[in-house]
Amino acid sequence: MLWLFYSSAIIASVILDFVGIIMSLFITVVNYKTWVKSHRISSSERILFSLGITRFFMLALFLVNTIYFVSSNKERSVYLSAFFVLCFMFLDSSSLWFVTLLNSLYCVKITNFQHSVFLLLKRNISPKIPRLLPACVLISAFTTCLYITLSQASPFPELVTKRNNTSFNISEGILSLVVSFVLSSSLQFIINVTSASLLIYSLRRHIRKMQKNATGFWNPQTEAHVGAMKLMIYFLILYIPYSVATLVQYLPFYAGMDMGTKSICLIFATLYSPGHSVLIIITHPKLKTTAKKILCFKK
């Protein structure tokens, strides 16, 4: 029964992954066309373009890896497994840093805090985006290289995977994976949760203030603020379980967990990327309008 549940979780993760690939490609193409057409692109659209490309390759790699894992009758070498792990770690870390940068940009630009740090960031963050994007990639490359360096000290044993008798022996080298993951993810988690929480608090305060004034309450600016607040709330709902599930997957005792727990972790870990991409589309005016045109929902 648990194997059936786990198989269903794998099928669900493949479907979600496929949806995420389509959504990421859509975000990339729309922002690229905007860039080519107007010969300029905003800071947020530049981040979305980078995020779309990174997520597309990350989810495509995950899909190929899953299909190969399920369909292969042959034993799987440790080198191929290590290649998939390293590429996925780099792409996943890059996409998370892009999301962190996007949330920070939204927080700084939309909130109206008068603290000197916020005012300084508000003036300087947009011009720095072209430099911060490569910095995100370099940080991801550094954490991946750190993983490789640490894994050389305690190398992975031979990893053999069979179709009908799956066996992962990763007791050695797991510490290096956990260390590199925590170094990268903990800072991302703190920045994302802080940015989202500050933005939600600021927008709620702004909306309540406008409700009290009751003059021209619902205008395009307020609608954009409400959309940003919804995006942050739903982002936290997806991101926090994803972070917990991903961390659990990298811990040594994960291999000994029952299939039910593994299935839940797999679903939460897979749901985040496509779910967040869908949220971006339905809360971004230009992406939402283009999606409606494609789906023939425009009145």
Swiss-Prot record:
The protein's UniProt keywords, in alphabetical order, are: Cell membrane, Cell projection, Cilium, G-protein coupled receptor, Glycoprotein, Membrane, Receptor, Sensory transduction, Taste, Transducer, Transmembrane, Transmembrane helix
Report TM segments.
Answer: 10-30, 47-67, 82-102, 132-152, 173-193, 231-251, 263-283
Task: Give an example GO cellular component term for this record.
Answer: ciliary membrane
Q: Which Gene3D superfamilies match?
A: Rhodopsin 7-helix transmembrane proteins
What is its membrane topology?
A: Multi-pass membrane protein
The reply on keyword Transmembrane is yes
> Which InterPro entries does the annotation name?
TAS2R (IPR007960), TAS2R4 (IPR030055)
Superkingdom per UniProt: Eukaryota
Q: Which protein are we looking at?
A: Taste receptor type 2 member 4
Q: Which organism is it from?
A: Papio hamadryas
